[in-house]
């Protein structure tokens, strides 16, 4: 078969003085690269395709081809063949074996040359399959370059300038690492190259649905702008992936690389968001993309069972790198010891028993990142201010979608053509606008630029089993403003002067211990799954795995208003029987002594010194001209 010019491999300059191969030898003249009738990825070939490839190279010995079929030599095994294996397959001549080996090595080299290599600051040099590159080079994926990974956190941590784009590349890479490792350790799992490619695509595309400033958009803005809509960025990712596939002609490319679009697109979506349809009965396997014997594949990108997945591994490493925080979790070690075992008639990814402590450390790392960075008190208030600005601008921003239809910031999620155009750049569009209708939104963003932020008042927690319900969040500012501090104040504050931010901190599964949902195996019985309870690990592990933090901010920033806001806040904490703010005795020394539970006999504070501090505090504000 004669190749088209576009398919000719580029010739490299010779680096030695050896004579050229004579033109009548198969290794020089034969068409040894994949032809039009063969799949471009040799790893997808079965024995018949391997035989076809060898015949085209001039290797037509019946014994060789017969042994290839009988031994079921597939394309994936070609790089593993050496001279001794060829001899066993019936190639008796040493010269022929060398020619055959050279022929196959050229094929492998061509395949390697088609892989794109990028240099990632976290994972080093990453190889990307041509299909992944085709997906990356689309407007829908490139959009992720313009969405900050940590939203308003960049205004607090100057190194946190990374975006969803590079995180998505990292997750796609790690997904491939884990699924390849499982396949190599356990060939009986029959993980195909098609499975590998689908898992990598799911990792690559899992965050396509994020909006401006990442979690600020789906966690703060959408619930306020459209409270009737229960929308998540995972749902957005599935919709955007569908749009990416259809608008860029990706289905034929998927078929070219051995995928079956009808099944595999469904499988990729299910890995991102879970089952697309609820099963009729609980006992039924809820997924359509892969059968139950491939259930473990659904635990790689987004693990709904226990939260141990490659998404976390990448953002732990990447966020810590950019934040300047130490990452204590080693995902490479987890991959080394990961194994698939049968648990409750399902195949699940299990960890080695000795790794249980490291997994607790992983969830502790997650909690620590939330405390130190993701829920930083200044980062959160910047997210809140950006949300306020977007809400004020929502009615006046127009984004063109399919068919020329116009959408607002909050409704762009209904049309993926419009949503593709919605990124962090909307911040600058509002900030630099001259439209009088955007004046209020513009002023809020200017305050962020000038660092005139809403002021942090304090933090508290509910006591006992009490938790503030989500439906009560909206009424909390009014509660704070209704608290009547038993001190003389120069100003009176209203509900609209306060912002109350409720933060739910946990190990990823609300009150549950995620390790209770992890299966382990031991060295002596690697195919038998076991459970390990918390008490079997250490007596120093957490008793509770969730807590609620309540932070109060004041929109007024003058000193008298801030002093009043702190008195309102501490009084509210006392009225609601919340914990005493850590600096309560300093910011409200006349209020904290009135709460008996806050001043038990074990307190190390000196009452006399506390009274003196109170007098000093009152005197300070009394004489202050303000």
UniProtKB/Swiss-Prot annotation:
UniProt's post-translational modification comment states:
Phosphorylation at Thr-592 by CDK1 acts as a switch to control deoxynucleoside triphosphate (dNTPase)-dependent and -independent functions. Phosphorylation at Thr-592 takes place in cycling cells: it reduces the stability of the homotetramer, impairing the dNTPase activity and subsequent ability to restrict infection by viruses. It also inhibits ability to suppress LINE-1 retrotransposon activity. In contrast, phosphorylation at Thr-592 promotes DNA end resection at stalled replication forks in response to DNA damage. (Microbial infection) Phosphorylation at Thr-592 by Epstein-Barr virus kinase BGLF4 and human cytomegalovirus/HCMV UL97 leads to a reduced level of dCTPase and dTTPase activity and the loss of viral restriction.
Mutation effect (residue 385 to V): In AGS5; loss of function in defense response to virus; loss of oligomerization
User: What's the catalysed reaction?
Assistant: a 2'-deoxyribonucleoside 5'-triphosphate + H2O = a 2'-deoxyribonucleoside + triphosphate + H(+); dATP + H2O = 2'-deoxyadenosine + triphosphate + H(+); dCTP + H2O = 2'-deoxycytidine + triphosphate + H(+); dGTP + H2O = 2'-deoxyguanosine + triphosphate + H(+)
**Expression across tissues:** Expressed in heart, skeletal muscle, spleen, liver, small intestine, placenta, lung and peripheral blood leukocytes. No expression is seen in brain and thymus.
Task: Please tell me, according to the UniProt entry, what happens when changing residue 374 to G.
Answer: Abolishes dNTPase activity
- Provide the effect of residue 145 to Q: In AGS5; loss of oligomerization; decreased ability to restrict LINE-1 retrotransposon activity
**Basic and acidic residues bias locations:** 1-19
**Keywords noted in UniProt:** Acetylation, Aicardi-Goutieres syndrome, Allosteric enzyme, Antiviral defense, Chromosome, Disease variant, DNA damage, DNA repair, DNA replication, GTP-binding, Host-virus interaction, Hydrolase, Immunity, Innate immunity, Isopeptide bond, Metal-binding, Nucleotide-binding, Nucleus, Phosphoprotein, Ubl conjugation, Zinc
What residues does dATP 1 bind to?
149, 164, 210, 215, 312, 315, 319, 366, 375
- Provide the effect of residue 319 to A: Abolishes dNTPase activity
Query: Where in the numbering of this chain does the HD domain appear?
Result: 164-316
Q: Which residues bind dCTP 2?
A: 119, 156, 333, 352, 354, 372, 376-377, 523
Q: What is the effect of changing residue 451 to E?
A: Impairs homotetramerization and abolishes dNTPase activity
Catalytic center residues: 233
**Which disease is this protein implicated in?**
Aicardi-Goutieres syndrome 5: A form of Aicardi-Goutieres syndrome, a genetically heterogeneous disease characterized by cerebral atrophy, leukoencephalopathy, intracranial calcifications, chronic cerebrospinal fluid (CSF) lymphocytosis, increased CSF alpha-interferon, and negative serologic investigations for common prenatal infection. Clinical features as thrombocytopenia, hepatosplenomegaly and elevated hepatic transaminases along with intermittent fever may erroneously suggest an infective process. Chilblain lupus 2: A rare cutaneous form of lupus erythematosus. Affected individuals present with painful bluish-red papular or nodular lesions of the skin in acral locations precipitated by cold and wet exposure.
Quaternary structure?
A: Homodimer; in absence of GTP and dNTP. Homotetramer; in GTP- and dNTP-bound form. Interacts with MRE11; leading to stimulate the exonuclease activity of MRE11. Interacts with RBBP8/CtIP. Interacts (via its C-terminus) with CD81.
UniProt protein name: Deoxynucleoside triphosphate triphosphohydrolase SAMHD1
Organism this protein belongs to: Homo sapiens
């Amino acid at each position: 078969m004669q190749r088209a010019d576009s398919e000719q491999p580029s010739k490299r300059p010779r680096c030695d003085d050896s004579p050229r191969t004579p033109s009548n030898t198969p290794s020089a003249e034969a068409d040894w690269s994949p032809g039009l009738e063969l799949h471009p990825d040799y790893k997808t070939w079965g024995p018949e395709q391997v035989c076809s490839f060898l015949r085209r190279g001039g290797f037509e010995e019946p014994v060789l081809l017969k042994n290839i079929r009988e031994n079921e030599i597939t394309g994936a095994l070609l790089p593993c063949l050496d001279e001794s294996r060829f001899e066993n397959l019936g190639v008796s001549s040493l010269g022929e074996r060398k020619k055959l080996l050279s022929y196959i090595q050229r094929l492998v080299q061509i395949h390697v040359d088609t892989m794109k290599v990028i240099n990632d600051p976290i994972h080093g040099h990453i190889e990307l399959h041509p299909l992944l590159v085709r997906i990356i080079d689309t407007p829908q994926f490139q959009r992720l370059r313009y969405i900050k990974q940590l939203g308003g956190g960049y205004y607090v941590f100057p190194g946190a300038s990374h975006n969803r784009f590079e995180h998505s590349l990292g997750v796609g890479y790690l997904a491939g690492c884990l699924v390849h490792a499982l396949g190599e350790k356990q060939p009986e799992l029959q993980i195909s190259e098609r499975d590998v490619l689908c898992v990598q695509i799911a990792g690559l595309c899992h965050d396509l649905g994020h909006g401006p400033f990442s979690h600020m958009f789906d966690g703060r803005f959408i619930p306020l702008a459209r409270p009737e809509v229960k929308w998540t960025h995972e749902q957005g990712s599935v919709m955007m992936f569908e749009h990416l596939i259809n608008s860029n002609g990706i289905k034929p490319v998927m078929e070219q690389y051995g995928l079956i679009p009808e099944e595999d697109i469904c499988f990729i979506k299910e890995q991102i968001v879970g089952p697309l349809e609820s099963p009729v009965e609980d006992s039924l396997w809820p997924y359509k993309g892969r059968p139950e014997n491939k259930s473990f594949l659904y635990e790689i990108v987004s693990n709904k069972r226990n939260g141990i997945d490659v998404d976390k591994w990448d953002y732990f490493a990447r966020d810590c790198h950019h934040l300047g925080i130490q990452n204590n979790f080693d995902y490479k070690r987890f991959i080394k010891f990961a194994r698939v075992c049968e648990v409750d008639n399902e195949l699940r990814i299990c960890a080695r028993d000795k790794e249980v402590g490291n997994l607790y450390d992983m969830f502790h790392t997650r909690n620590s990142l939330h405390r130190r960075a993701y829920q930083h008190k200044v980062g959160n208030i910047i997210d809140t201010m950006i949300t306020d600005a977007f809400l004020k601008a929502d009615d006046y921003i127009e984004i063109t979608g399919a068919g020329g239809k116009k959408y607002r910031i909050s409704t762009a999620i209904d049309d993926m053509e419009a949503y593709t155009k919605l990124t962090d750049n909307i911040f600058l569009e509002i900030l630099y606008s001259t439209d009088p209708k955007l004046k209020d939104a513009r002023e809020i963003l200017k305050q962020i630029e000038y660092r005139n932020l809403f002021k942090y008042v304090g933090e508290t927690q509910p006591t006992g089993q009490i938790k503030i319900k989500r439906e009560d969040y909206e009424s909390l500012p009014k509660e704070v403003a209704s608290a009547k501090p038993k001190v003389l104040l120069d100003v009176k504050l209203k509900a609209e002067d306060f912002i109350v931010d409720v933060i739910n901190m946990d190990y990823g599964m609300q009150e549950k211990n995620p390790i209770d949902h992890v299966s382990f195996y031991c060295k002596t019985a690697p195919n038998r799954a076991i459970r390990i309870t918390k008490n079997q690990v250490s007596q120093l592990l957490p008793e509770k795995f969730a807590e609620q933090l309540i932070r109060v901010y004041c929109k007024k920033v003058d000193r008298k208003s801030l002093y009043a806001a702190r008195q309102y806040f501490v009084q509210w904490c006392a009225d609601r029987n919340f914990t005493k703010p850590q600096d309560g005795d300093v910011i409200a020394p006349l209020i904290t002594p009135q709460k008996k539970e806050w001043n038990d006999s074990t307190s190390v504070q000196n009452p006399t010194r506390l009274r003196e501090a109170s007098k000093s505090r009152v005197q300070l504000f009394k004489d202050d001209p303000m």
